[in-house]
Regions:
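Short C-terminal domain-edge/linker segments immediately following a structured domain
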Residues: 38, 75-78, 126-131
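Gly/Ser/Thr-enriched, mixed-charge loops and adjacent short helices
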Residues: 108-178
Length: 178
């Protein structure tokens, strides 16, 4: 049974081990892969934050995404803006970030971009709920961590300070980078 409340206006969010179980995440991946392929794209960037449930969700999501021959460009553990950056300068303008954002540690979710536009959980809700299970063993993953250095260079090139200052960083439970 799918908790329909996980489908939100700007993302998908819920209790990682209950609402976002492997079966549901896989279905979401299948639906997103179809949506991406309809735009003429055949790749998607994928990043995760540092939550304990991220790798399990990633594995199930990749299974669903690859079920329709979509190539997953794996960014690894990165801050959310890096996924958006990748969709602007990389090999595709589609990306998914597995992140619980500011929510409690038991939660997790997905932020999705297709053709430079945010994907609402509402947009895919009915397709996910009505999807019949489809099995496949095809996995097509490429390492895309080379974009991390480009992202860092872009950030540093836009930060010109007139003098040396002390900086404190609070990543807010996110993946703040190296």
């Amino acid at each position: 049974m799918i908790n329909e409340n996980i489908f939100r206006a700007y993302d998908i969010r819920g209790k990682a081990d209950e609402d976002l179980n492997d079966s549901i995440i896989r279905k979401i991946g299948i639906v997103l892969s179809k949506k991406i392929l309809k735009t003429g794209q055949n790749k998607v960037y994928l990043g995760t934050d540092c939550r304990l449930s991220a790798n399990r969700i990633k594995k199930s999501l990749i299974s669903g995404l690859c079920s329709n021959d979509l190539e997953v460009l794996d960014l690894g553990m990165v801050p959310t803006p890096l996924v958006y950056f990748a969709t602007k300068i990389g090999k595709t303008n589609c990306g998914i970030m597995i992140t619980g954002s500011h929510n409690p540690k038991e939660d997790n979710g997905l932020k999705m971009v297709i053709n430079d536009g945010a994907v609402s959980g509402f947009e895919i809700k009915n397709d996910v709920i009505n999807l019949k299970n489809k099995t496949t063993n095809i996995v097509n993953i490429s390492d895309a961590r080379d974009l991390i250095e480009q992202y860092e260079n872009e950030i540093f090139s836009n930060c010109k300070l007139p003098k040396k200052i002390k900086v404190v960083l609070d990543s807010g439970n996110g993946a703040a980078g190296p």
